[in-house]
Regions:
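A short, hydrophobic C-terminal helix/tail in secreted or cell-surface proteins
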Residues: 381-385
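Metal-dependent phosphoester/phosphodiester hydrolase catalytic core
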Residues: 1-380
Length: 385
């Protein structure tokens, strides 16, 4: 452990083991909470299946002068070799044991562009589902025949390997089958950020995780994505915040994006926040009632870029905007992307709170001052280059 570091300054570091030396990396400490930095610059990224593409976006990101990086999940993928693509191949079968997860993390860490970016600045990381199992929820596996007790054994292995391989605080040391990942950070009084865990405490996806209208199951007050303890912690953190900007770094789309498929009613993802509409409305109502300063939600997961206005109910455009949401595309997952999709005009017509949408690969860079938030979307046409 390195102690007595001064606030708001850069440090350089190098590792030496058995006569072998690493490249020289750099990191920085954040400004003191009660100071007022003029500017902050960061990037956020997610979803980097090495089978579906190269991590080219990190080469561009490493050219930027960033204070930090948020990674919003799907840092690794659990699938068996060849399941997702042919650009590169995972080693072995679908990962389940501690050894499996350690090897998969090591394989991803071998990527030179990922190494390059880790050596540039500090990272705030959180997981989504693929660090463990696709669309998992608490102790419930995507595979219906897996018992919760068996899935928790797998979860403990995944969490242990994640902690060993990711830049995390001591407060995140795993305990049995659990690991506390949600936490706070700040960049002086310019920004405070709450990093969430949207998988470990969530109830099962309603409607069998099938795209559905906002029905009774999606509105169930007992359903939760965050769990009671984390939700209360988030509210308290927002109340106590002194930041001009309040960043909520999390996994899945909070915007209520519905698709019609030529049907009268819109259908919504039950794995995203529309599947937990009651809790979503409660959080946004809280932000509005408490007049939280400039809440901005950062999201990954769906391999595309979005800029959304967030309301308590996004279907009611005549109500006030409570927060903004920026959804960042994938580093590699999904393979080659596209600038516009075929039905984009209808998508935005059905969901007028969407202000931008794009499906190329890349990352998002954000620059904050006391008065402005600027997003630059960096994209690439091909994932195999």
């Amino acid at each position: 452990t390195v102690g007595k570091l001064k606030p708001n300054r850069w440090y350089w570091f190098q590792f030496s083991v058995n006569g072998e030396e690493s490249v020289i990396g750099r990191t920085r400490t954040m400004p003191k909470r009660f100071t007022s930095p003029k500017e902050m610059s960061f990037a956020f990224a997610s979803c980097q299946s090495l089978e579906q593409g190269y991590f080219t976006a990190y080469d561009s990101m490493a050219q930027d002068e960033l204070d930090l990086v948020f990674h919003l999940g799907d840092y690794i993928y659990e699938y068996t070799a060849g399941n997702q693509g042919t650009i590169r191949k995972h080693h072995g079968k679908e990962i389940e044991s501690l050894s499996d997860y350690r090897v998969r993390h090591a394989q991803y860490k071998m990527d030179p562009l990922l190494q390059k970016m880790h050596a540039r600045c500090p990272w705030f990381v959180t997981w989504d589902d693929h660090e463990l199992d696709n669309n998992c929820a608490d102790d419930i596996s995507e595979q219906k025949n897996v018992k919760p007790v068996d899935f928790l054994i797998r979860r403990a292995a995944a969490y242990q390997a994640y902690y060993e391989n990711m830049p995390l605080r001591r407060t995140s040391i795993p305990s049995g089958t659990s690991m506390k990942l949600y936490r706070k950070g700040s960049f002086g009084q310019l920004a405070e950020f709450s990093v969430l865990d949207g998988r470990q405490y969530r109830s099962n996806q309603p409607n069998n995780d099938v795209r559905s209208p906002i029905n009774e199951a999606a509105l169930n007050p007992g359903s939760t994505m965050l769990g009671t303890e984390q939700r209360n912690w988030l509210k308290q953190s927002l109340i106590q915040s002194r930041g001009t900007w309040n960043i909520i770094a999390q996994q899945v789309m909070m915007g209520m994006v519905g698709t019609s498929n030529n049907k009268k009613s819109l259908n919504y993802s039950m794995d995203q926040w529309p599947g937990y509409t009651h809790e979503r409305m409660d959080l946004l109502r809280f932000m509005e009632d408490r007049k939280i300063s400039n809440p901005v939600v950062l999201t990954g997961d769906i391999h595309s870029n979005w800029a959304n206005e967030l309301r308590k109910d996004d279907r009611k455009m005549d109500t006030p905007t409570v927060a903004a949401e920026f959804v960042g595309t994938s580093i590699a997952s999904g393979g080659d992307g596209q600038d516009r999709i075929k039905n984009q005009d209808k998508l935005i017509s059905d969901n007028p709170f969407i202000k931008f949408h794009n499906r190329q690969r890349g990352y998002v860079k954000c620059t904050l001052t006391q008065k402005t938030w600027t997003c630059l979307l960096y994209t690439t046409d091909a994932a195999d280059e």
